[in-house]
Design a protein with these regions (language model features):
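Glycine- and charge-rich intrinsically disordered segments
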Residues: 1-4
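Metal-dependent phosphoesterase core characteristic of DEDDh/y 3'-5' exonuclease domains
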Residues: 6-12, 27-30, 36-98, 103-175
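Short acidic, Gly/Ser-rich segments with clustered Asp/Glu that frequently serve as metal-coordination loops
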Residues: 17-25
Length: 175
């Protein structure tokens, strides 16, 4: 009798961000929406949505590359600098700063919930069964997702949870 093998279930997570602008190095995330879809049945089995409260810029969200800085630049990097929220981007998404202040969740909490969502969406064991990210212009959304998890200090957990590989600079790139 042949050994029984468990059929693998592959999952895609539809990712969509609303943002304060187009540059993930300068602009903030304002809203995230996720949708988990089984690739065998095309069934949507989980959803997540959250507004993200305003937060400050951090070096942790930038790609790791060697950058020479003067002492003055290093000292200046210690102060709070708010992320950009361009009015055109807010108008396009119909999100206001008041909405973000009153309904927005802490960025670190949102990042943790995104990783928890992906763990729930992993329906089979094995590295090849980790969820893949899907969406329209997904490279744009991935940049903001990386900013979110890096700022929250969850980059290692992000790498364990999603399917992906490392680029030339050693940065994890999900696929």
């Amino acid at each position: 009798m042949a050994p029984q093998t468990e059929q693998k279930i592959y999952v895609g997570i539809g990712l969509d961000f609303e943002t304060g602008g187009l540059d993930c190095r300068e602009c903030a995330c304002t809203q995230i929406a996720l949708q988990a879809v089984r690739f065998d049945t095309w069934q949507v089995f989980d959803r997540y949505q959250a507004y993200i409260a305003p937060y400050g810029k951090q070096d942790a969200g930038l790609p790791r590359r060697k950058v020479l800085r003067t002492r003055h630049e290093q000292a200046k990097g210690q102060e709070y600098v708010p992320m950009k929220y361009e009015q055109a981007a807010l108008d396009y998404s119909a999100i206001t700063m008041e909405m973000l202040r009153t309904q927005g969740m802490d960025m670190k909490k949102v990042a943790g919930e995104v990783i928890a969502f992906a763990k729930r969406a992993t329906l089979s064991k094995g590295n090849q069964c980790k969820p893949v990210l899907v969406g329209q212009n997904i490279a744009f959304d991935i940049g903001f997702l990386q900013q979110l998890v890096n700022y929250a200090g969850l980059a290692a957990e992000f790498e364990k949870t999603f399917s992906g590989s490392r680029d030339y600079y050693g940065n994890f790139q999900p696929h």
